[in-house]
A protein has these predicted regions:
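Hinge/lid segment of periplasmic solute-binding proteins
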Residues: 104-158, 293-295
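Short helix-initiation/N-cap motifs at beta->coil->alpha
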Residues: 77-86, 180-186, 254-268
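Conserved N-terminal structural module of periplasmic/extracytoplasmic solute-binding proteins
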Residues: 2-9, 13, 21-110, 123-128, ...
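Short, solvent-exposed loop/beta-turn-alpha elements that line the ligand-binding surface or hinge
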Residues: 117-134, 177-180, 198, 217-240, ...
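Glycine-centered hinge/linker elements that transmit conformational signals in sensory
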Residues: 188-193, 227-259
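Paired acidic/hydrophobic, glycine-rich loop segments that form the ligand-binding mouth/hinge
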Residues: 98-101, 273-277
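C-terminal lobe and pocket-closing loops
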Residues: 121, 281-291, 300-395, 425-433
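A local structural motif
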Residues: 68-77, 172-178, 226-227, 244-257, ...
């Protein structure tokens, strides 16, 4: 899921630079916006990822400026890989924007973002029907930290399991429950039943076990111990379960079929029985006439399912010269912006009540099931800088899939390196507290 990450180095540098800027009141801040005093026009700078959302962003800008005629919203897009570098450079020059994308709790914890609580109360925004893991603390993509909310968004992206109902029917396999989901063992077994090599049909596609396994399997409850967990019997078993699907020719390796980049394309062609991937881009599948369903990701028996959920988390820099107007924008983004994004991009509103009001599902069972799954979104165990910490896991998975090592051997080798990364991550986290 590299498309969700910002590099640890870039984020750490951002935190240092932003803290320095925030501590220098004489320098001011806020992206070079005009003062806005005495009724003068106000300029808000908003930096986002370049995601091909220009229709939505244009409509968002136009709608906000019509609602707040004294404010000029300047939207600047950057490629996701360069966003952190661009932000670092701007901060070093004292020209950081007013509105930024938020990359987890680090910025919140450092006091670099304005809390949204008062604005939410004043605007009457009801968070009770928002996707839970975004507005509750603890998750990687959560907007909450220590009883305060620091960002909000306009849509809900998630990882779910899509399945082709017609292929299930042809194989005489009952549809899986929407929630709770299949176990990984059932997932692999069904994948092999659905595989039809003669007709070019793979039973399933999934990148690796971490695409669906809860993080609690890899770390202790306090998030500070990896050894004995990441290489413990439960994770070893799950490596073996998924690897068996590869070995039996039921699941392609990611270098053959990348489920994140190609999964929906193959699924829309009827060449996949199941795929664990982003629950987005559904019109392509629907226009192809695929009779599909959706469930939460496979989860070992006895464990609470966990799946990734994200949004376009937008926060207000504490150095903004125009905090009131910037807060107004976040409010607009997460209210009217949800409607605009639904109308233009067909994305799921972050507020599930809004999704129901606009009839996002439109009577399509797969969409209705996807909304049910989202209502169960929960926070994961907190691991600072988790993607860099877990890095050696991917090497271990590669060794197992390649047949070079057993699951136990590969994970035993990876565990000390993951623990070392984890210790360093917590050391950095604690030093910034």
């Amino acid at each position: 899921m590299t498309w969700r990450r910002v590099s640890a180095a870039a984020l750490s540098l951002s935190l240092v630079l932003m803290a320095a800027c925030a501590g220098n009141d004489e320098e001011g801040g806020g992206g070079g916006a005009e003062t806005g005093g005495g009724g003068e026009p106000v300029t808000l700078d908003f930096w986002v990822f370049e995601e091909g959302l220009f229709g939505y962003l244009d409509a968002l800008e136009q709608g906000f400026e019509e609602t707040y005629p004294g404010v000029d919203l300047v939207v600047t897009t950057y490629p996701e890989d360069n966003y952190g570098v661009k932000l670092d450079t701007a901060i070093a020059a004292g020209k950081e924007p007013d509105l930024v994308l938020v990359f987890g709790p680090d910025q919140m914890r450092a006091g670099l973002l304005l809390p949204l609580d008062d604005m939410i109360a004043e605007k009457g925004i009801d968070l009770s029907t928002y996707v839970p893991s975004i507005v509750n603390p603890g998750d990687e993509f959560s907007c909450a930290y220590e009883d305060h909310l620091y960002c909000l968004g306009s849509y809900a992206g998630s990882v779910q399991m899509l399945y082709n109902k017609d292929l299930f029917d042809a194989a005489g396999i009952p549809y899986p429950a929407t929630y709770p989901p299949l176990t990984p063992e059932q997932f692999v077994d069904i994948a092999c039943q659905l595989t039809d090599e003669a007709n070019g049909v793979w039973g399933a596609a999934v990148s690796d076990p971490l695409a669906y396994l809860p993080w609690e399997m890899f770390f202790s409850a306090d998030g500070k111990t990896a050894e004995g967990y990441v290489n413990g019997p439960d994770v070893v078993h799950q490596f073996e379960v998924l690897a068996s699907g590869y070995d039996r020719g039921c699941i392609p390796s990611s270098n053959v079929l990348d489920p994140w980049q190609q999964g929906r394309d193959f699924f829309a062609k009827g060449q996949l029985g199941m795929v664990i991937t982003d629950f987005q881009g559904l019109p392509k599948i629907e226009e192809a006439g695929i009779n599909y369903g959706s469930t939460s990701s496979p989860t070992p028996s006895g464990m609470e399912p966990y799946f990734f959920v994200w949004t376009d988390s937008v926060g207000v820099m504490a150095t903004s010269d125009h905090p009131d107007q910037a807060l107004d924008f976040v409010a607009y983004l997460t209210t009217e912006g949800q409607l605009l994004r639904h109308d233009i991009n067909d994305d799921i509103p972050l507020d599930l009540a809004v999704a129901e009001e606009v009839d996002w599902a439109g009577g399509i069972p797969g969409r209705e099931e996807g909304l049910e799954v989202l209502s169960h979104a929960r926070s994961a165990i907190f691991i600072p800088n988790r993607w860099d910490v877990i890095g050696p896991y991917y090497d271990a998975w590669g060794f197992v899939v390649g047949g070079e090592k057993t699951a136990q051997e590969a994970l035993d080798e990876a565990a000390p390196a993951i623990q070392e990364n984890l210790d360093k991550a917590w050391e950095v986290w604690d030093s910034q507290g």
